[in-house]
């Protein structure tokens, strides 16, 4: 049996380990922390096919969704087939979603709902100024903190994948991985190190059109009395953030309106989404700052912008904020949706999925290992 080493136990590493094990490899995952604590646990937990462009990326997202569902059912990980609503409050936003639905009538299960219909799918939506909403039934929600912690246990049980936590890889070369003075050998090595560019192959990363993105997020206290928000929510600003909408001719006018009327939201890359976890908390965000180094301090101003926009289209039984945090992920600067490099025949780097790691990783990993 051939063996493989995967470096990193975030979502990209876990997806790669699963894909390799499914092909018959003996797999060892090496993670520098006692559990993954990076971008993979600092997100909404949204598997979000509606945001991916029609074609290869949508197919990849739907394959990932299928794998997520399979794993969650088998491993008893909480998940919800919540679907999603993108609420619109201005004619310019409505034009974009009308165009989107017309373009995708043969490729997606989506439709425009009247305000009353949208509120039936999510009681969190405000009726004031609501023109309608783009409904999609494909979105799936997990709690990333729970899922990323539980998946290693299941992958070990089902496929015998070995996990070595608290083991920092310092060097990789052909067929060898160094952890301190220990040497691990493998037929294939996959480096899935997320926003950590500085330790493994830093010179190679320096040649790539890749950067980092810092985002700020929040989470409410658990909603009282078992209240559920239903569909995952977003609103007009989200139309400017996801590639699925880029071919809508009316998007250009919408962007210009936001630049004129909401310049601070454009400056900080803010669009506002909400998803509810199984324990009742609602995860909110986010902003987008780009660069290779960030100050470690969150900006209260950004959090207030997020909450102000949220309050304009939602209401929750409690909006008490229990937690705030930031996350950082790798992002391509050239429009690419991932970075796959081969420093040598037996070493592969998988990175640069931007903010779509939860949505695309399982599908991408299968594609990457399909030829081995």
Predicted ranges, named:
Residues 211-214, 221, 230, 235-311:
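Conserved FAD/dinucleotide-binding core of flavoprotein oxidoreductases
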Residues 269, 277-283, 289-372:
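C-terminal catalytic lobe of FAD-dependent flavoproteins
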């Amino acid at each position: 049996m051939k063996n493989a080493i995967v470096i990193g136990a975030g979502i990209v590493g876990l997806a790669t380990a699963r894909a390799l094990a499914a092909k018959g490899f003996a797999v060892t995952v090496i993670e520098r922390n006692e559990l993954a604590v990076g971008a993979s646990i600092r997100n909404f937990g949204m598997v979000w096919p509606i945001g991916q462009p029609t074609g290869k990326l949508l197919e990849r997202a739907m394959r990932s969704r299928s794998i997520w569902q399979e794993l969650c059912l088998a491993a008893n990980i909480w998940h919800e087939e919540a679907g999603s609503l993108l609420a619109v409050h201005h004619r310019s936003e409505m034009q974009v979603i009308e165009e989107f639905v017309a373009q995708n009538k043969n490729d997606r299960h989506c439709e425009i709902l009247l305000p009353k219909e949208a509120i039936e799918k999510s009681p969190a939506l405000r009726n004031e100024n609501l023109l309608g909403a783009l409904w999609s039934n494909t979105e799936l929600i997990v709690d990333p903190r729970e899922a990323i912690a539980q998946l290693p246990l299941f992958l070990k049980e089902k496929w015998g994948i070995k996990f070595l936590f608290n083991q920092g890889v310092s060097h990789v070369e052909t067929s060898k991985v160094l952890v301190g003075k220990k040497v691990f050998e493998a037929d294939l090595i996959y480096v899935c190190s997320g926003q950590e560019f500085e330790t493994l192959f830093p010179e190679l990363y320096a040649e790539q059109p890749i950067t980092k993105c810092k985002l700020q997020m929040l989470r409410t206290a658990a909603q009282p009395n078992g209240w559920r928000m239903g569909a995952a929510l977003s609103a007009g600003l989200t139309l400017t953030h996801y590639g699925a909408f880029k071919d809508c001719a009316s998007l250009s006018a919408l962007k210009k309106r936001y630049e004129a009327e909401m310049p601070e939201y454009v400056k900080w890359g803010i669009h506002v989404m909400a998803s509810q976890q199984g324990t009742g908390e609602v995860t909110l965000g986010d902003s987008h700052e780009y660069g290779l180094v960030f100050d470690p301090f969150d900006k209260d101003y950004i959090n207030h912008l997020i909450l102000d926009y949220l309050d304009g289209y939602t209401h929750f039984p409690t909006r008490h904020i229990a937690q705030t945090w930031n996350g950082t992920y790798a992002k391509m600067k050239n429009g690419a949706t991932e970075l796959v490099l081969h420093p040598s025949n037996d070493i592969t780097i998988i990175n640069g999925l931007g903010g779509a790691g939860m949505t695309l990783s399982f599908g991408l990993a299968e594609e990457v290992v399909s030829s081995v």
